Amino acid sequence: MTPVNICDGWEVTTVEGLGGKDTGYHPIQAAVSETGGSQCGFCSPGMVMQLHAYLEEHPEATKLEIDNILDGNICRCTGYRPILDALKQFASDATHKKLDSLVDIEDIKLCRKTGDRCHGTCANAGHCTDYVAASAAWHQPTTLQDLQQILSQFTSETKYRIVGGNTGTGVFKRDEESYDYFVNINKIPELKAESTNPMSLGGNVSITDAIAFFNRVGKSEPMWTAIARHLGWIASYGIRNQGTLAGNLMMKNAHNDFPSDIYLSMATVGATLEIVDHSGASEQVSVEDFVTKDMNRKFIKTIHLSMAKWLPPKINIGFNRVMKYPAEFIANGGHRAGASRTFCRTFKIMPRSSNAHAYVNAGFVAHVDPENNFLISGKPTVVFGGISPTFTHATKTENFLMNKNMNDHEMFKEALQTLASELEPDFDPVLASPEYRKQLAMGLFYKVK
């Protein structure tokens, strides 16, 4: 899935490099062996390396976090209990910690420039490296100007692919067959930028980094923790590490029937995309308009996440009002005075708990006033994926719900009828039946009441 050329400048550690019978086993390897966590041995290297890589980034990982990173690792003979028993010994909240008295030998060799352990990649930094092979050419720009120059050399007929994580080939395998040029954008820092004022993310930010970003801003605006939670349902931990926001959206652009969770999440919060073409000209479009946009010789530079749309009207009736909903789904609209609160909730119904596309996914956002019978202030957002390639917003339902009371049961029955009238799932032999998907979407809408 990952092209070898993307690995230029990486520090790669294999399970053999981690330890072995000749050089001595790494503590993680030893723990798996001691707890009976390996039988046939096929899954063991993946389990060991997954934890090793995670502890490199998160040395204070908890048992729950270690549990969650294994959503892409499959064991078919040993069973997960002895494996988890071994790996959770390395958690910060473990009763018995395996690494209490052990020091990683790599930490002894420090970089004189950074004071951190040496990654051995300084010599490769900052170079635009191109490769030309018999089958295809590989370009590796390091600036936006380099990228624009490369794109300007292409025509509308040129078969090229912009490469971020390249995880999309696991979904649409035929997309990889006929490209003459590959453009690796992982060396361009602007495409990995993050900002909280105003809120934005670079197009090439990984899904894992986006989750961390939304969890950080969610501490002051809890609405974003709902988005972080939804992104955590995408694929598996390893794919989220590599896959990017723009790459996922580009799959939606090329395949409108793809039930993209990035697309749904961004539509839920009203995000806009900054699109730049080969000449450097830029424009901002909504994610809904993006799916039909011609992206030839263009790329997604930035995803803008302005909160302006979701700042509630000022209602001067008190401070620090509390809604009786789970905190992870409620934000207080910029901490302004008043009782109006932003309600945000998303769903993903899938055949498995991870590594699966949605049958139906959904997102709901509304300003509600708990002091006024949960009055919906203004126009809410009601979006669905998995209905049809052209359906996103339940526009009739959104308009019907304006300035309605959520606690009015008769009103909600009318809203369900309105929603039923505009939900028309298409037939696809690969998907669940249209009838099932329609009832599922209506059930999710009812669940937020």
Positions of predicted regions on the chain:
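Membrane-interfacial loop-to-helix junctions in multi-pass transporters
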Residues: K21-Y25
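C-terminal structural segment of proteins
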Residues: M1, E11-T14, P27-S38, V48-K449
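Glycine/small-residue-rich loop that forms an oxyanion/phosphate-binding "nest" at active or ligand-binding sites
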Residues: V4, T14-G19
